């Protein structure tokens, strides 16, 4: 995909990395090594591999560039019964800040967006299966609602744009205040 974009447009200025999956939800002691490895592979390692490939295209790029990684607010304060996913997203946050430090001198900004509960098809399905969860998650937000995907997308678009040219190494929450509640 990177080769196609680079060949078609002869440049690559902005990239959003969004990789996530959780292999099971349950108590920490219930996870198998395979569950842990699969979650890390799909959530952290996949993003890391993308970042490595992107850097090859961007490091000698004459124009400023921006990378946004999608994290999760579970990385900021842990997540009971989904701890491996939370840990994998915490690794994404650390990778984001490490990459920002390494790549700033090449005029490449790297940030992460950390969504809370967002009204996606997967979340809707979860609420169908667990109706009480929706109310509990709405109450955990200072704004008393679930976020919408376009609210995350607007922040990503801003961070990828030149309007955010002085922002790098940041983990920015889009969670209705639930991370501070």
Stretch-by-stretch model annotation:
Residues 72:
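Residue(s) in the substrate-gating loop at a strand-loop-helix junction
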Residues 112, 135-163, 167, 176:
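C-terminal helical subdomain
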Residues 13, 29-49, 68, 85, ...:
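Catalytic Tyr-X3-Lys loop
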Residues 105, 117-140:
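A glycine/serine/threonine-rich, flexible loop-to-helix segment
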Residues 22-25, 77, 157, 168-181:
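Short C-terminal tail/terminal secondary-structure segment
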Residues 22-37, 56, 60, 81-84, ...:
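Conserved mid-core segment of classical short-chain dehydrogenase/reductases
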